[in-house]
Amino acid sequence: MTGVFDRRVPSIRSGDFQAPFQTSAAMHHPSQESPTLPESSATDSDYYSPTGGAPHGYCSPTSASYGKALNPYQYQYHGVNGSAGSYPAKAYADYSYASSYHQYGGAYNRVPSATNQPEKEVTEPEVRMVNGKPKKVRKPRTIYSSFQLAALQRRFQKTQYLALPERAELAASLGLTQTQVKIWFQNKRSKIKKIMKNGEMPPEHSPSSSDPMACNSPQSPAVWEPQGSSRSLSHHPHAHPPTSNQSPASSYLENSASWYTSAASSINSHLPPPGSLQHPLALASGTLY
């Protein structure tokens, strides 16, 4: 019995040592295997089969610790005929990445809403509370110089509407912005329309309205001159020439007085009594009503 036992022990040990060596070599060097493999033995079939026994030190696909040990990778195996298969790795749902991502996303969405509030407060500084009611603060009015007003007035008399190049040129020449020129023309047009609607004379038709430095005093009324002054004007026609602003009634009186005085002088030269012509001369050179 001892002889038989001695013969069986080496065979068992050699089989036990050869199987792990072959399987370990196959697992560490899978790329060196040829695509056409010879017929496998019982030991090889145990290794390549998913349900077969696995050597000590390596994780079996069906073991409980397989999913945890090889979580980020996939375990590949080769079948008997060279076909390859894979076991899918375990998903990352255990680590609750999706829930944490939604939490961070919600916090990120809440942050811009909090930052936008001070921006609105900064962009609306023109609203002021007066007696508990919001009131907008108006911008200060533009003060134009006399030179700028004269230039704008002359340009407005030429045309009431400016094109974009003309407005830019006028604003650059006067040292104003295009917005200021545009607003001035708009206000001027509205003022003219309001005056014309009320039936009044626009200021452009008044004398010397284009020159702001000129004196716009009203004209003096026509002077009704007596008889002596009319005679003096007839004897000295170049002393006081009639002005263009004189009314037609006064010019007509002067012409008639000169004609009557010339007629009276001719009559006085032919008639000896000079006192007889005083009454018709007084009637002729008198005032007309």
UniProtKB/Swiss-Prot annotation:
This is Homeobox protein DLX-5. Gene3D superfamilies: Homeodomain-like. Phosphorylated. Phosphorylation of Ser-34 and Ser-217 by MAPK14 enhances its transcriptional activity. Phosphorylation by CaMK2 increases its protein stability. The gene is DLX5. It is linked to Split-hand/foot malformation 1 with sensorineural hearing loss, autosomal recessive: A disease characterized by the association of split-hand/foot malformation with deafness. Split-hand/foot malformation is a limb malformation involving the central rays of the autopod and presenting with syndactyly, median clefts of the hands and feet, and aplasia and/or hypoplasia of the phalanges, metacarpals, and metatarsals. Some patients have been found to have intellectual disability, ectodermal and craniofacial findings, and orofacial clefting. It comes from Homo sapiens. GO terms for molecular function: DNA-binding transcription activator activity, RNA polymerase II-specific; DNA-binding transcription factor activity, RNA polymerase II-specific; HMG box domain binding; RNA polymerase II cis-regulatory region sequence-specific DNA binding; sequence-specific double-stranded DNA binding; transcription cis-regulatory region binding. InterPro entries: Distal-less_Homeobox_TF, Distal-less_N, HD, HD_metazoa, Homeobox_CS, Homeodomain-like_sf, HTH_motif. Residues 1-49, 198-251, 270-289 are annotated as: Disordered. The modification Phosphoserine is found at S34, S217. PANTHER family: HOMEOBOX PROTEIN (PTHR24327), HOMEOBOX PROTEIN DLX-5 (PTHR24327:SF31). GO terms for biological process: anatomical structure formation involved in morphogenesis; BMP signaling pathway; cell differentiation; cell population proliferation; embryonic limb morphogenesis; embryonic skeletal system development; endochondral ossification; epithelial cell differentiation. Belongs to the distal-less homeobox family. It is found in: Nucleus. Keywords: Activator, Deafness, Developmental protein, Disease variant, DNA-binding, Homeobox, Nucleus, Osteogenesis, Phosphoprotein, Transcription, Transcription regulation. Residues 32-48, 206-220, 242-251 have a biased composition (Polar residues). Transcriptional factor involved in bone development. Acts as an immediate early BMP-responsive transcriptional activator essential for osteoblast differentiation. Stimulates ALPL promoter activity in a RUNX2-independent manner during osteoblast differentiation. Stimulates SP7 promoter activity during osteoblast differentiation. Promotes cell proliferation by up-regulating MYC promoter activity. Involved as a positive regulator of both chondrogenesis and chondrocyte hypertrophy in the endochondral skeleton. Binds to the homeodomain-response element of the ALPL and SP7 promoter. Interacts with XRCC6 (Ku70).
